[in-house]
Amino acid sequence: MTTPLQLAAATTAMARRGNFIEPHFSLLEDVDAGAPVPIGESMDWERMIDAMEDVLHGERGTARGAARGLNYRIAGKTGTAQIVSIGQEEEYDAAELEERLRDHALFVGFAPADSPSIVVALIIENGGSGGTTAAPVARKIFDYWLLDRNEGSRPPNTNYVATINQRVLEPKHADSN
């Protein structure tokens, strides 16, 4: 089991091309985070980051829908954590499960990909797919941080997750009628 903070710390090391910085909480933007600890070779990090960019910007990326209309590049990874085992001959149908048994949606990423200023790691409990649920929420956070925050706008609405869940789960349920 990994916490969102651990995911954020690992993603920060990726964004910094292998320079790990111990995570800390602060209300300030400019804080001395201590000396970075180098990990691995730069070429290896670039290959991984290219693959993470393809998750959002590649033709077959699992979060390509969340990147539509972007004027900056995000590097990210989606994930889906299964809560209950599904038999080999069975098919997963979220609409048929109690909400508490639905898959968790995960996303980790950073932006802009070439010169990161923000890392996002989120887990949406019982949210379904990381690409269709968590990545769009992360996109809202990235947009706020990179585009809107200096214009005095408010952070993304937390009801956005409920809206996504409705959009993702209701069509499947309607098809079964």
Regions found by a protein language model. Name each.
Residues D148-N177:
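Gram-negative outer-membrane assembly/targeting C-terminal domains
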Residues D30-S42, A162-P171:
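Short, mixed-charge aromatic SLiMs
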Residues M1-P36, M43, M52, L56-G152:
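Active-site beta-strand/loop architecture of penicillin-binding DD-peptidases
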